[in-house]
From Swiss-Prot:
Essential cofactor(s): hydrogencarbonate
NCBIfam families assigned to the protein according to its UniProt record, in alphabetical order: menB, PRK07396.1
Cross-referenced PROSITE patterns: ENOYL_COA_HYDRATASE
Keyword Iron-sulfur: no
Name of the gene encoding the protein in the UniProt record: menB
Source organism (scientific name): Salmonella typhimurium (strain LT2 / SGSC1412 / ATCC 700720)
Pathway in which this enzyme or protein is active: Quinol/quinone metabolism; 1,4-dihydroxy-2-naphthoate biosynthesis; 1,4-dihydroxy-2-naphthoate from chorismate: step 6/7; Quinol/quinone metabolism; menaquinone biosynthesis
Name of protein: 1,4-dihydroxy-2-naphthoyl-CoA synthase
Annotated signal sequence range: none
Catalytic activity: 2-succinylbenzoyl-CoA + H(+) = 1,4-dihydroxy-2-naphthoyl-CoA + H2O
Tree of life domain: Bacteria
Quaternary context: Homohexamer.
Length: 285
């Protein structure tokens, strides 16, 4: 996507509703390559239940495999909350949150991994409260655009919960060990400027400009090489994610190699039942 005039980055976005079949989220796509997933439970500050997470997983998978989508926005309905974390009213006694059939889930962990491994940038658009599991979700996104009314923090130790995975380790990478311990141990809340100062968000904008500025950031990324963005995301993740991160980065390297004449020579030779001839390819220093 090319925007010859910078003012076009702020042009009104045309959203197409793709929400059929969903009850807890709204799912939309723009005409210029942006998908938007909105947690639609404002009556509970967009807290998620197992169904909410299941629908977000489905929508993000659709956005990943849609060739017309280059970047994804994750947000919450209304201006009062991005997401307040897991809905404590459906938290059960057997290790998770109950669905309508009584089965317990922690499927938000699957959604965290999905955001992390999605080869397309995922941008959190945060207004109001981003608390608990919702705070972890915004951290998992590649970028966070916050409204001036955004509030950030963890509540786990106050409600008998914690996220010892990315919610702790990745937070420490972002804000440092001491600050991460403060955020988790004290369960304080932080305003948007404080979050910006500690590196939890990328920018803070007036609430009225939140979507406009988020779309601008998305459109800027859409002008860049999708393969470069994909590999950069994998490389940045690999710094934190151990062998799983290396596997993701290596998979992208394999994909690039498959696109080369050298890689295709090996495949063609196998299919043609002949010895491959790699002598024509340079051995660069």
């Amino acid at each position: 996507m090319i925007y010859p005039d910078e003012t076009m980055l702020y042009a009104p976005v045309e959203w197409h509703d793709c929400s059929e079949g969903y009850t807890d989220i709204r799912y939309e796509k723009s005409t210029d390559g942006i998908a938007k997933i909105t947690i639609n439970r404002p009556q509970v500050r967009n807290a998620f239940r197992p169904l909410t997470v299941k629908e977000m997983i489905q929508a993000l998978a659709d956005a990943r495999y849609d060739d017309n989508v280059g970047v994804i926005i994750l947000t919450g309905e209304g201006d009062k909350a991005f997401c307040a974390g897991g809905d404590q009213k459906v938290r059960g006694d057997y290790g998770g949150y109950q669905d309508d059939s009584g089965v317990h889930h922690l499927n938000v962990l699957d959604f965290q991994r999905q955001i992390r491994t999605c080869p397309k940038p995922v941008v959190a658009m945060v207004a109001g409260y981003s608390i608990g599991g919702g705070h972890v979700l915004h951290m998992m996104c590649d970028l966070t655009i916050a409204a001036e009314n955004a509030i950030f923090g963890q509540t786990g130790p106050k409600v008998g919960s914690f996220d010892g995975g990315w919610g702790a380790s990745y937070m420490a990478r972002i804000v440092g060990q001491k600050k991460a311990r403060e955020i988790w141990f004290l369960c304080r809340q932080y305003d948007a400027q404080q979050a910006l100062d500690m590196g939890l968000v990328n920018t803070v904008v007036p609430l009225a400009d939140l979507e406009k500025e988020t779309v601008r950031w998305c459109r800027e990324m859409l002008q860049n090489s999708p393969m470069a963005l994909r590999c950069l995301k994998a490389a940045l993740n690999a710094d934190c994610d151990g062998q799983a991160g290396l596997q993701e980065l290596a998979g992208n390297a394999t994909m690039l190699f498959y696109m080369t004449e050298e890689g295709q020579e090996g495949r063609n030779a196998f299919n043609q039942k002949r010895q491959p001839d790699f002598s024509k390819f340079k051995r660069n220093p």
